[in-house]
Amino acid sequence: MTPVLCHSTASIPNPNSLMSLSSTLRLSSSLLRRSFFRFPLTDPLCRLRRTEPSATRFFSSRTPRSGKFVVGAGKRGDEQVKEESGANNGGLVVSGDESRIVPFELHKEATESYMSYALSVLLGRALPDVRDGLKPVHRRILFAMHELGMSSKKPYKKCARVVGEVLGKFHPHGDTAVYDSLVRMAQSFSLRCPLIQGHGNFGSIDADPPAAMRYTECRLDPLAEAVLLSDLDQDTVDFVANFDNSQKEPAVLPARLPALLLNGASGIAVGMATNIPPHNLGELVDVLCALIHNPEATLQELLEYMPAPDFPTGGIIMGNLGVLDAYRTGRGRVVVRGKAEVELLDPKTKRNAVIITEIPYQTNKATLVQKIAELVENKTLEGISDIRDESDRNGMRVVIELKRGGDPALVLNNLYRHTALQSSFSCNMVGICDGEPKLMGLKELLQAFIDFRCSVVERRARFKLSHAQQRKHIIEGIVVGLDNVDEVIELITKASSHSSATAALQSEYGLSEKQAEAILEITLRRLTALERKKFTDESSSLTEQITKLEQLLSTRTNILKLIEQEAIELKDRFSSPRRSMLEDSDSGDLEDIDVIPNEEMLMAVSEKGYVKRMKADTFNLQHRGTIGKSVGKLRVDDAMSDFLVCHAHDHVLFFSDRGIVYSTRAYKIPECSRNAAGTPLVQILSMSEGERVTSIVPVSEFAEDRYLLMLTVNGCIKKVSLKLFSGIRSTGIIAIQLNSGDELKWVRCCSSDDLVAMASQNGMVALSTCDGVRTLSRNTKGVTAMRLKNEDKIASMDIIPASLRKDMEEKSEDASLVKQSTGPWLLFVCENGYGKRVPLSSFRRSRLNRVGLSGYKFAEDDRLAAVFVVGYSLAEDGESDEQVVLVSQSGTVNRIKVRDISIQSRRARGVILMRLDHAGKIQSASLISAADEEETEGTLSNEAVEAVSL
């Protein structure tokens, strides 16, 4: 009768317990881990049969059915069923042969049965043994092939033969699981050192399935024979009975190297899992020898010999922090990148291609190529024109053709970020150690293997010693017989039987029974003198062998030396160069800046604090005196405040009217179309209520010799080192202390050799040297820059580079210079849309706190809006290559060439630059250099071929 789970009458649970029975069956992985070490394999809880007899009781929450509950028929008729009273909730008691009834509470049985199942999965299926690095199925496959004589020197045999042998003798599970395990041990892209040589289709890195087992053939790899299966017949490991007790199989293979680290392992058990990366054989031997020589070696010392895993598919391991964690604690994250190189496809068009030659471990190449194609299709990856897989038997080659002008580094970074070309290997180094699953670091794994290998070498030495001693004992008896051959022959011929001859030899020469038997088995041809010499030589050889074995077994040091020697021999025979390269740069995590092109862009800020970022080709080049193109719709009573040119990777410094500076990357500002209103700055910066941004400075590098020159509306100037602004916190920092009623308006980058040009709203211009402005700290006030009259205010400021100072100093203010055709010039822009160029040599340098020279003759309702130094670079005809962007209060933008603006004297009124009509006044102006124009010529749209980006 099958045992039935039951409760005894005295232990009937209450209804609440019955209702919560299902929750009792929910076992967590934490319960398994807590319980595992509490119950060894020999614990009674792991037994399937219970011996305590009692009555079997069935419980039901429903009313019992009428009649008798028949438990069985035929021979079970002696069992009787009787009804219980309602007090027992309608239970039925089965009485009969109580020795065949097993009472047990259901929730306990469920817990313990699940625990037994979990232990079975842990120890017998999912986790590898730290000694030979194999799971039971892999061990049984290799042992079955060894028993079938499928060595590397013999012909291949069908895989179906191996699978059948494994299933029939050692592994009574599905043939698919066995064949899949066999196939994986033959794949060079799955194991760093394959253990089986395959003949036929064994799958591919594209996840193509292998051919059926009836078609493929296999045999053992020489490395498997040398590392795992040698000395198997010398009592080096224990053998256990197979599933039906018909024969024996090894409990572990006598590995000569830590195969768990050599090929790694992965598996999912109940409540725990393992994922161990593969390593290089040569480095593994080196670190093993280092630990043998110095058992107290630190992890850093071991890393000098084996710095990181070595994956069979190669790749680049990024950083060593994850490797250190994995080797120290057993858990870590190793970031692996595929290996790619840039190849020039067409020298004429300068089109490039990214060639992928290696991919991360356990990455499906076909899936990777398909994923890249999908990302190109949905515009996630840009700059790619074609992708194809040219891989063959000679190696991997995935070609990704780039569009003309595409940045290979940017495309690669996007591939790393959006595809499996960069992936992480999560190490979880769990293995079976001393019959229990254990999380171990590198040193602990190596030490566990060394202890096991010492045991194997000791058992092998004792086995050889025993055989040598037995053989020497026999040889000594044979030599005695040969020394007395005539007497021995006479004694044997006189003996009446075999047993009497044996007894006579023992008594006559003091031989043992085995020695006497050996003498009787000698043939006549071995009685020659030559044969006698062979026996004596063998005796001497055995004596020497016994001495060496006894010396080996005398100390652990000798055993460790032999382990090291055998490991070095394997290294000399099987080692190969490292495939996975190490890059000691970072963890491989890509920031936004790594995947965003450093393109030039336009940034517009309104008076009410709205900002937007636009593409460089948004505004085309126009002629002087035209209306221009709108920069977008503005809110009611809003006007354009600033309009500048920057690059996506620049740090953009936002200076407020209160002297506070904020910072963000340019690409973090949302990109908008020309007609969009923009994003409020308060959503990007932590600005105070009522605070306005008055100046924006893009910075690509915080150089030591660069400064920020700040100028307030009331003419207060200050110079601060640019490096002090490299670490601006999110809430901003103080840039300048302001006097009451003053506000910060202009901030420019400069060097000590530059000049600064300042202009007031009434047209007064002053030139001063930047080195004449003392460098101050951030949290200080400035000094007076320009003496202002009649409630005049500062209108603009610009920097004159040091390269232009020499030209300016060589020229004097002369009438012949009024129409000077070579720069540099000061470009004046008025609020009413007028402007002109005045030679820079028309203005003399002065110290700070001076009135300056008049530079413009205004109409009654006009004032100066901006001043720029132009003429940094000239065309072949000596004219300026720069352009100026004008923005009106209504948001209309016009971009014109500087060369189209007339060169006039200081007292002239200028020419019309932009017809304002209903657009209000000029709100801001920005200058575009010729270098900026050249950088972005290839990025303009077809509709703006003649345009240059801002």
Swiss-Prot record:
Its EC number is 5.6.2.2. InterPro entries: GyrA (IPR005743), GyrA/parC_rep (IPR006691), Gyrase/topoIV_suA_C (IPR035516), Topo_IIA-like_dom_sf (IPR013760), Topo_IIA_A/C_ab (IPR013758), Topo_IIA_A_a_sf (IPR013757), Topo_IIA_dom_A (IPR002205), Type_II_DNA_Topoisomerases (IPR050220). It catalyses: ATP-dependent breakage, passage and rejoining of double-stranded DNA. The keyword Plastid applies. SUPFAM superfamilies: GyrA/ParC C-terminal domain-like, Type II DNA topoisomerase. Residues 127-595 form the Topo IIA-type catalytic domain. Pfam families: DNA_gyraseA_C, DNA_topoisoIV. Keywords: ATP-binding, Chloroplast, DNA-binding, Isomerase, Mitochondrion, Nucleotide-binding, Nucleus, Plastid, Topoisomerase, Transcription, Transcription regulation, Transit peptide. One of its GO terms (cellular component) is chloroplast nucleoid. One of its GO terms (biological process) is DNA topological change. The active site is at Y215. Belongs to the type II topoisomerase GyrA/ParC subunit family. A type II topoisomerase that negatively supercoils closed circular double-stranded DNA in an ATP-dependent manner. Made up of two chains. The A chain is responsible for DNA breakage and rejoining; the B chain catalyzes ATP hydrolysis. Associated with the mediator complex. This is DNA gyrase subunit A, chloroplastic/mitochondrial. The gene is GYRA.
